UniProtKB/Swiss-Prot annotation:
Subunit structure: Interacts directly with MAPK1 (wild-type and kinase-deficient forms). Interacts directly (in GTP-bound form) with MAP2K1 (wild-type and kinase-deficient forms).
Protein name: DnaJ homolog subfamily C member 27
Compartments, as annotated in UniProt: Nucleus
SUPFAM superfamilies: Chaperone J-domain (SSF46565), P-loop containing nucleoside triphosphate hydrolases (SSF52540)
Length: 273
């Protein structure tokens, strides 16, 4: 069994697990934990210095779970402190602020940091990840929509929740699902449960939706060079349409991506003789 897994327990027995939080500074990691554990919201921002540690007990089905929570500082300055806490982890709360695109874009870097610190023998497949799209109460400042965040999470087999530490929305549901998944992981010999969402669309579909969403124009969206012929434009459009048609693709954002492809084709063909 992998090093990050606790010893397998019989049903009904207590279980001890380690959970860490990851994400940029000021995305609300500490506030999410406080909202769940202490049922309160701290409006004044207090930066986490290095690591905050806490213990809580929860019950999942007929088991008592002792949860050791390591709330890790998101500022790069504290890398030398937090890099000691990645190992022997069963669950990760990965947080970004829906009003800060850079905090969403940084999620891949956080995963890379964890993978680096776990080393060649570490296995991130034996860890439950939950992605929290936090601060959804700040609707006016939102710049990362739900479909974009959900696509990123589900394409990696991660859980995904929309949360607000301020109002409490999504917090309890997130933690309950998170802990149940960790218990299932432990009882399944360290194998991450396969979610329906992670198996419902392909990496090719997810990559295509992300590329379309981030494209800089119609040529870029279809993946053809400026000045391409009508046949080349139609061929590129057909390929993407088959891949992303809403009747066949259930990936978050597929319907909008499909419409964008059709509109891009129409716009380009107007200017091609």
């Amino acid at each position: 069994m992998e090093a990050n897994m606790p010893k397998r327990k019989e049903p009904g027995r207590s279980l001890r697990i380690k959970v860490i939080s990851m994400g940029n500074a000021e995305v609300g990691k500490s506030c999410i934990i406080k909202r769940y554990c202490e049922k309160r919201f701290v409006s004044k921002y207090l930066a986490t210095i290095g690591i905050d540690y806490g213990v809580t007990k929860v019950h999942v089905r007929d088991r008592e779970i002792k949860v050791n929570i390591f709330d890790m500082a998101g500022h790069p300055f504290f890398y030398e402190v937090r890099n000691e806490f990645y190992k022997d982890t069963q669950g990760v709360i990965l947080v970004y602020d829906v009003g800060q695109k850079d905090s969403f874009d940084a999620l891949d870097a956080w995963l890379a940091e964890m993978k680096q610190e776990l080393g060649p023998h570490g296995n991130m497949e034996n860890i439950i990840f939950v992605v929290c799209a936090n601060k959804i109460d700040c609707t006016k400042h939102r710049c990362v929509d739900e479909s974009e965040g959900r696509l990123w999470a589900e394409s990696k087999g991660f859980l995904y929740f929309e949360t607000s530490a301020q109002t409490g929305e999504g917090i309890n549901e997130m933690f309950q699902t998170f802990y149940i998944s960790i218990v299932d992981l432990c009882e399944n010999g360290g194998k991450r449960p396969t979610t329906n969402s992670s198996a419902s669309f392909t990496k090719e579909q997810a990559d295509a939706i992300r590329r379309i969403r981030n494209s800089k124009g119609s040529w870029d969206m279809l993946g053809v060079k400026p000045g391409a012929s009508r046949d080349e434009v139609n061929k590129a459009c057909r390929k993407l349409a088959v891949l992303l048609h809403p009747d066949k693709c259930v990936a978050p954002g597929s319907e909008d991506a499909f419409k964008a492809v059709v509109n891009a084709r129409t716009a380009l063909l107007k200017n091609i003789k």
